[in-house]
Amino acid sequence: MTWDEKFNELFNRCFSAYVNGNSDFMSYYTPNDREFLASIGYKPRELFDFVEDLADEGLPAKSTALLVAAVRRDYFLTIQSGKTSPRAISRSDVPSFSETFEGFAYLPRIVAKAEAKLRGELDPDMMFGCGGDRKFLRENGEINPADFLRHVWAAAGDLSKVTEFVKKQNTTPPAAASS
């Protein structure tokens, strides 16, 4: 079975457990499941966040969860040589919701979260692809979260390059920061 088939099978099993009333996501995983998640650079909470949001909000789609996992896996195996980072980025380490860059509210925050997602450094209480991230991506050209991650990876820390990508996707002017 390929890694993506394993991911989909695990996602389906976790989704079923959650919609049937089990919110203890750590109970979803066997030792083999945890080993599999580690092999793709994923943490148990990362998968659960996508399961929970799909069950509770109808978004993001399972295919989005797989695409995001594919980007993380590629980064983990290619850039990190299969070695996890010991660092954890918390809410206080990322820019605020209202911080802007070149007129784009939230852009510095979502880029910081995307960079941490790529490195596997997001605190378990943070999610790349949360409602705020989805809102930003939707309002700026219906950008798929996995595409955004790949562009953040390619930008190699250059926020201007990410901004140019967002501008090309966006057919409306940037939303002003709300106070």
Describe the function of each predicted region.
Residues 37, 122-166:
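Amphipathic alpha-helical packing elements
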Residues 1-124, 157, 162, 166, ...:
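Polar/charged low-complexity regulatory segments
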